[in-house]
Amino acid sequence: MNWSIFEGLLSGVNKYSTAFGRIWLSLVFIFRVLVYLVTAERVWSDDHKDFDCNTRQPGCSNVCFDEFFPVSHVRLWALQLILVTCPSLLVVMHVAYREVQEKRHREAHGENSGRLYLNPGKKRGGLWWTYVCSLVFKASVDIAFLYVFHSFYPKYILPPVVKCHADPCPNIVDCFISKPSEKNIFTLFMVATAAICILLNLVELIYLVSKRCHECLAARKAQAMCTGHHPHGTTSSCKQDDLLSGDLIFLGSDSHPPLLPDRPRDHVKKTIL
């Protein structure tokens, strides 16, 4: 594995995340990915070999193991971590796409032409929706996998002994699980970290939506103030002052704010794409 590429992806995800997103990223890669890589394979490496049943009937142990462990914990966690981390990489790819588009625009129209994005990494327009959808997807994946784990293993606990009566077992046999206490501790740790990640995703989602609503209300308030000061529709001077002070917020697409004839482009200070 090329760790330099991996480090670059992590730094990109961290750069374009909020404070809640950075905490989530640290929690995932320190308390979930690293713990999984260091511990999970060792704890579950001998689960099938050491699954003993008090019978010599050929095939009985294999059938009972498949009945009580339809999907391995390790495989489920691996799939969960892959699905949880991919949306964050999509945000980085979206920013990279914006930067490429901005570069091509400058090459085609010159350095003095208008910019497509005032800040390609700022969460505005399509990038805002990409980030929000990634939060919803990550929380949904963790919730779905917690439900799957609970369905396969009630209360996420493995009993030390299970009773099996599946064919070809001659009767009800007792089967013994290897290292149940260690596996239970590790399982509960992974469940707890997944629950904390879900909470962080929901808090970050609420933060982003409330921030966007606040910006929309501020923009409408600014427009209402301009209309109140100029009841006859002559609002250009008011908009000029708002542009100079950086208070007027433009919502919607990634286009530039309208340029006014008596002010140069350099005075436009804040634009929401």
Swiss-Prot record:
Entry GO terms, CC: connexin complex
* Matching Gene3D superfamilies: Gap junction channel protein cysteine-rich domain
Subunit (UniProt)? A connexon is composed of a hexamer of connexins.
Give the matching InterPro entries. Connexin, Connexin311, Connexin_CCC, Connexin_CS, Connexin_N, Connexin_N_sf
Q: Which Pfam family, any one of them, does this sequence belong to?
A: Connexin
Predominant location of this chain? membrane
What is the recorded function of this protein according to its Swiss-Prot or TrEMBL entry?
A: One gap junction consists of a cluster of closely packed pairs of transmembrane channels, the connexons, through which materials of low MW diffuse from one cell to a neighboring cell.
The name this protein carries in UniProt is: Gap junction beta-5 protein
Residues in the Extracellular compartment per record = 41-75, 150-187
Transmembrane ranges? 21-40, 76-98, 127-149, 188-210
Family, according to the entry, reads as follows: Belongs to the connexin family. Beta-type (group I) subfamily.
PROSITE patterns in alphabetical order:
CONNEXINS_1 (PS00407), CONNEXINS_2 (PS00408)
Membrane protein topology class: Multi-pass membrane protein
Which keywords label this protein?
Cell junction, Cell membrane, Gap junction, Membrane, Transmembrane, Transmembrane helix
Q: Where in the cell is it found?
A: Cell membrane; Cell junction, Gap junction
Cytoplasmic topology ranges = 1-20, 99-126, 211-273
Instruction: Indicate the segments annotated as coiled coil, or none if absent.
Output: none
Instruction: Name the gene.
Output: GJB5
One GO biological process this protein is involved in is: cell-cell signaling
Give the Gene Ontology MF terms in alphabetical order: gap junction channel activity
